[in-house]
Amino acid sequence: MVARISPGRVYAVGISLGSAVAAYLSKERPLAGVLLVTPFDSVEAIAKESYFWVPVGLLLRHRFPAAAFMTGNPTPAAVIAAAEDRVVKPPRTEALLAQLDNLVFQATLQDAGHETLYELPAYKTTLQAAFGALRDAASQAAHRRRDKSLPHPMIAAEHGSPGAAPDE
């Protein structure tokens, strides 16, 4: 079934820990876009910040390195953060943002926490705006791919390609 779905129609959405999973998916598969809500650079960085006296690097089996997954990743990305997030603090989101090569939308909702973000009326409109930006980016990318596959009119005319402008 996956083979029948055009990558230009698939978006990955990840919320909190799921943002690292969505980032990984966007690295491994061509996607139209990826939406990361309350994302972070890595679980290891969050753990080190909160438990600086513990050798978290030795204890973590899965580091969920979202920033590493997004480095050099051409997938259009949208990010929604919570200004009052106490789970994923702003420096962790900022570290991820610094690695995004194709950021098409970014919003930080004020008066929003990690768990309360979804209750705000602004969340729905922000989601809609994020998906709109991702859709626009995917559409532009599709046009660029299509334009690259078409021969330039002058080249087509020189080679007598079908549909080329006739010589005058």
Annotate each PLM feature.
Residues 1-4:
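Alpha/beta-hydrolase active-site loop
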Residues 7-53:
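Primarily recognizes the serine-hydrolase "nucleophile elbow" in alpha/beta-hydrolase
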Residues 55-69, 75:
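Active-site nucleophile elbow and catalytic-triad environment of alpha/beta-hydrolase enzymes
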Residues 66, 75, 89-98:
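Short alpha-helix in the alpha/beta-hydrolase fold that links the catalytic acid
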Residues 72-74, 78-85:
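Short beta-strand/loop motif that positions the catalytic acidic residue
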Residues 84-88, 114-115:
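Acidic catalytic loop of the alpha/beta-hydrolase fold
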Residues 112-124:
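Catalytic histidine-centered segment of alpha/beta-hydrolase-like enzymes
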Residues 135-168:
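Alpha/beta-hydrolase-fold serine-hydrolase catalytic core, especially in secreted/extracellular enzymes
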